[in-house]
Amino acid sequence: MAKVKKAFFCKNCGFEAPKWLGRCPSCGEWNSFTEEIIARESGSVPATVAGPLPVAKPQRVRDIRESEHIRLDLGNPEVNRVLGGGMVPGSLILVGGEPGIGKSTLSLQIALAANGLKTLYVSGEESAEQIKMRAGRIGIGNDECLIYPETLLENIVAQIAEHQPDLVVIDSIQTIYTDLLDSSAGSVSQIRECAATLLKYAKSTGTSIFIIGHITKDGSIAGPKILEHIVDVVLQFEGDSNRSEERRVGKECRSRWSPYH
């Protein structure tokens, strides 16, 4: 039997507390705690998550292979430019934007246009048939792009381990859940756990991962604020109010690979 545990999570930063608190001791936000039910079985970690991850070992500085200069061409000059010349292998990139702004279309374009790269597009919001129809409208073909409609993190990690793609797109982080937790997809604990697992996989295997995140009414990315600190790059996708409504603007809000950081 799994041991059921109730906990309270801050919606702003993801801080966990055993009881409700009026003010978060981590970020200082008031009235931000929500109760979630977590079910964990003692000592149980799904093999699909724990198995494929290589174990890192300490290395001397002189023995570490330099790869910072290597960037992958995504086949889209504008996206490459925003990312500083291409995508760094093993990076976790968060793409945020309003509903309907075109996050899924942009991410599918990237997956299809990345010639020479094996890509995996994971959708928790559309069927394979719907994605194929959208790909047809985009008009870009890529035989190395795999489509996988799934929401269970353990299954997603297993498919990534099996196919070993260079690039993975997760659409969206709010629809993904892990069996390690009993809370619903999109909850603070689920978003934090899934993002942390994807980050660990990206760093240990060199697989680059794009995750799409929805934004709230106030313009911030839905989920705990810690999500933006877990990822390597935060891209904001929005409309250009000064130009045509069909024009979209991509902004790099944060990047570990920026020369200014």
Spans of features found by a protein language model:
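Detector for small/aliphatic-rich hydrophobic stretches
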Residues: A2-K5, E16-I93, A113, L117-K118
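Residues immediately C-terminal
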Residues: T175, K217, S255
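Positively charged, low-complexity/disordered segments
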Residues: G250-H261
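Conserved lysine of the Walker
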Residues: K103
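Conserved inter-motif catalytic segment of the P-loop NTP-binding fold
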Residues: G90, E98, L108-T197
